[in-house]
Amino acid sequence: MDKIQKIPDSEVIYLTSDLHFFHDNIIEHCERPCTKEDHIDWILNKINSVVKPEDIVYHLGDFAYGSNAKFSSLQEVFSQLNGTWRFIIGNHDKEKQLEALCQGTPHEVLGEYHSFYYKKRKIVMLHYPMETWDGKGRGRNSIHFHGHIHNKKITEIENRHNVCLDNEHKVYLLDDFL
């Protein structure tokens, strides 16, 4: 069994999901306060106004909208984002495309599920919300972060958090949940 990574307490970590670059219908579907023409700039501003180049960003799925995302366009957008990005695969992601995007960079694709320890808490990440997760029964020591549901409301479960961009139109600082 692999040992779960411990992230240094000094790291600044942000969480987000479901950016849906190159998905025009998401603007209306999730009531994003922008137009088709300024959608990419709106997303970049939401991220870069908070995330610094030295920060870590975990993206929990659906970075771009499948076949709508031309690789060269995606590279151009990705090069403008602050932070070191770590990707969890979502239902609209093309894993090979994300891997190619990260090739030769400090960014990485982590697969469909990832967990680590940070400030004595177990952090569990998946694109989809889970009813239960590793460590959930151990009090407040384990926290699950997910995306997928955008701005839809689901039954609240202690220590389960939706970090979709559409939830509050922001990226989330992990420390705010600890």
Explain the meaning of each model-derived region:
Residues 13-18, 162-163:
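Short, hydrophobic/glycine-enriched beta-strand segments
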Residues 103-178:
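Conserved beta-sheet core of the metallophosphoesterase superfamily
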Residues 6-7, 16, 21, 25-113, ...:
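Core catalytic region of metal-dependent phosphoesterases/phosphodiesterases
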Residues 1-8, 133-137:
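A short acidic-Thr-Gly-centered motif at the start of a beta-strand
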Residues 12, 56, 142:
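Conserved catalytic motifs of the protein kinase core domain
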